[in-house]
Amino acid sequence: LPPLLAEFNVAALLLRLADADERTLTSRIKALAGPVQAAGTALLVASHHNLVARAGADGAHVDGLQEMEEASSLRPQRILGVGQLHTRHDAMLAGENGADYLLFGEPDSHGERPSPDAIFERLQWWAELFEPPCVGYAATLEEAALFAGSGADFIMVADFVWSDARGPKAALADAQAAIAERFKQAFGAPQAART
């Protein structure tokens, strides 16, 4: 992982942990925090916001407004991002209540997610009107390129990077090149692709 982070322009790594006791979870986060942060990448922990400070992570990613409220003590010292915002109204409330970023397009607890066109529309709407950064969850390389044309501030690349037969290095290279190219086509200027 550290060589990948050193080579690519990765803004943040979202860590989703399997269920375990708090001590084990804290140890897992601590083991990754140093190498990830040394590469200039923020380490964000999904769902376990209560472990973020103790384990040395940079912040938490939570699902929905209720979890955002429960994790509000992280702000302003730590990053607090929120996803699973199913309506425009929920997204606006998250932005008004201090979310550091909003994630659109990630699967829900049943593995369902909006269509790529619906995600693009939500990203474009948010990017044009609001200040907090928006992140597009890309399940495929094609979605990563599509969402870059929406004006999204960041693109979160999903498991396709890890499942690529060529390895994550080749998949990340392709993703960042596709993101940069699509951004240039859409906005007429190059952008350093950040995933």
For the regions a language model picked out, list residue spans one by one.
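N-terminal active-site wall of soluble small-molecule enzyme domains
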Residues: 9-76, 120
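Alpha-helix N-cap and loop-to-helix initiation/capping positions
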Residues: 20, 24-27, 66, 86, ...
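Extended, intrinsically disordered, low-complexity segments
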Residues: 180-195
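Surface-exposed amphipathic alpha-helices with a cationic face
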Residues: 5, 26-37, 69-76, 92-95, ...
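Catalytic cores of alpha/beta
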Residues: 43-58, 86-100, 129-157, 174, ...
